[in-house]
Amino acid sequence: MGPVLRRRGGAPYWRWIQSIGSFISEQDPDQLSSAMGPGASHIAELIPGLREKLPDLTDSPALEPEPARFRLFDSVNTFLKNASQSQPLIIVLDDLHWDDHASLLLLEFLARGMAASNLLLAGTYCDVEVSRQHPLSQTLGSLMREQLFRRIQLGGLTQQEVSEFAELSAGVALPDNALDLVHRRTEGNPLFVNEIVRLLSQGEVATDPGWAATVPEGIRDAIGRRLNRLSSECNRVLTTAAVVGRQFNLDLLEELSSDFSEDQLLELLDEALKAGVLEEVRMGAERFQFQHALIQETLVSEISAARQVRLHARIGVALEELYGAEVETHAAELAHHFAEAEPVLGTEKLVRYSLAAGEQALAAYAWEEALFVFDRALAAKEGQPVDDDSAALLFGLGRSQAAMLDNQTRIEAYSNMKSAFDFYVDAGNVEQAVAIACSNTFPAWH
């Protein structure tokens, strides 16, 4: 299933939407209907494109938040288990440490339901990115207590493996002293080994007795040297792309790089592709991604906060133009960029897309993500007079909190929803006041 977007840059369940949506697009409608059964209408809440395959689906009846999420998860679990009966399925989840909370909850649910199925889940994550407070720690802890997964700790390459890697990947035969240094300096980390071998193969590291002093001390140093070999124009384009995210579309980059012609931009992308900095996501899809997340992070870290803010502003405006009438379906992505651009653009667009993204997250039972989105927008409006937007954000935040199982959070839900209710009453907006009073989260705070 490949890499996912950075957590706050994409919609909840993004990796599942991509992977299950891709699988669904390749299936016959009759097969889908059979594998999904009555759960098809529930899965359509997660994968809207399913209704194009199965146009006769009805809407799911409304439920309280927790039963509704269980119904969705159970429907996905049943579908994948049934689909794996005709042919075994392996789902590979890369970079789990970037997943949103809702995606990890779905992963945990599926892991519990895999018994007696032909479904295998395999995931990778960077352990140094996962603190005790990280959502993935909670997921792994729960699965470990129930003995539902096997952890395979990946150690570094041995000296012999480093030698073989250098020869196979770059045709470099490392002498013993060089091999020993490279192995010690990298601790066998394949990414770091790859970067140093690249430098060796390009003559970056001299063969004289002092060559060892030029070997990079860290992976970011090695990545920096690879970027230094690219033209300044290529680095400028890559920096813009890095602020977009790990993946980016060619049409967006064209909008953001108007000082280059199309041919010039393609030549610069070819330069980055040949250097192994970028790779095409799919041939012909005009979508690219950085070969490793650390390359993207290195580029972003090298520019000032002020420049990042202005790039996010340009990206948000360009995305609005590119998405056109479908802009609301990409609300989470736009909310992310306009949140980063708030110091120069203000809160208007941040609030607009946060309201849409929050409602979409609530509709997908991703309450944790909805809570984050609403809260972020409210924080940006702090100090401003309460208005319709603030009340709508408070209502959304309250519904997100009311869906949580934590009592303290539900108490906060009451306070936020009451604040929204009082504003609408004072403003004479009876319709919105009634909507709050009649919402299915009303019993949680009344």
Please place each PLM-identified region on the residue numbering.
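Short secondary-structure boundary elements
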Residues: 18, 155-157, 161-372, 376-381
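Conserved P-loop NTPase "ATPase switch" module shared by AAA+ and STAND
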Residues: 80-103, 120
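Sensor-1/coupling segment of RecA-like P-loop NTPase cores
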Residues: 106-153
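Structural signature of alpha-solenoid helical repeat junctions
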Residues: 326-333, 346-349, 369, 387-396, ...
